[in-house]
Amino acid sequence: MAKHKHEEHPEDVEVKETVETAEQAESASPEKSELELANERADDFENKYLRAHAEMQNIQRRANEERQLLQRYRSQDLAKAILPSLDNLERALAVEGLTDDVKKGLEMVQESLVHALKEEGIEEIPADGEFDHNYHMAIQTVPADDEHPADTIAQVFQKGYKLHDRILRPAMVVVYN
């Protein structure tokens, strides 16, 4: 029996070695996991920083685009308010019986208004030729004939205007149908 007490079983040796390697792994593992955690946190912070930086650039870009858009269309409301006055000037010029001086004065006012509008990018919409529903509003139709094909403009009731690529007011027209 004494012999058995001093002998170690091979199974016990394996168990002791396994316990020792597990203890070594545990002591080495916390260091490695702390390093891994620190690296993960650093990667996470870097990712958050990059996302925040990209978001800030997007905000700045959108603000810049909005500022440019506001600058481009800043005169839209003023133009819409002035267009009826321009229409009234055209009607006044169409009245017969005006003296030459009055007519010349009205034409000068009209020209200065049109020039000021052009400087702001406001242009009259051409209303001759073919009807385009993007720029013209048909308020009446008349029958087409040999001289006047369908979908062409017969008469302009009110001029249309656009500011760069925006329609301020479509031209009101009579269309051959």
Curated annotation (Swiss-Prot):
The keyword Chaperone applies. Pfam families: GrpE. Residues 1-19, 29-41 have a biased composition (Basic and acidic residues). It is found in: Cytoplasm. GO terms for molecular function: adenyl-nucleotide exchange factor activity; protein homodimerization activity; protein-folding chaperone binding; unfolded protein binding. One of its GO terms (cellular component) is cytoplasm. GO terms for biological process: protein folding. Keywords: Chaperone, Cytoplasm, Stress response. Residues 1-41 are annotated as: Disordered. Belongs to the GrpE family. Homodimer. Participates actively in the response to hyperosmotic and heat shock by preventing the aggregation of stress-denatured proteins, in association with DnaK and GrpE. It is the nucleotide exchange factor for DnaK and may function as a thermosensor. Unfolded proteins bind initially to DnaJ; upon interaction with the DnaJ-bound protein, DnaK hydrolyzes its bound ATP, resulting in the formation of a stable complex. GrpE releases ADP from DnaK; ATP binding to DnaK triggers the release of the substrate protein, thus completing the reaction cycle. HAMAP family: GrpE. This is Protein GrpE. It comes from Streptococcus gordonii (strain Challis / ATCC 35105 / BCRC 15272 / CH1 / DL1 / V288).
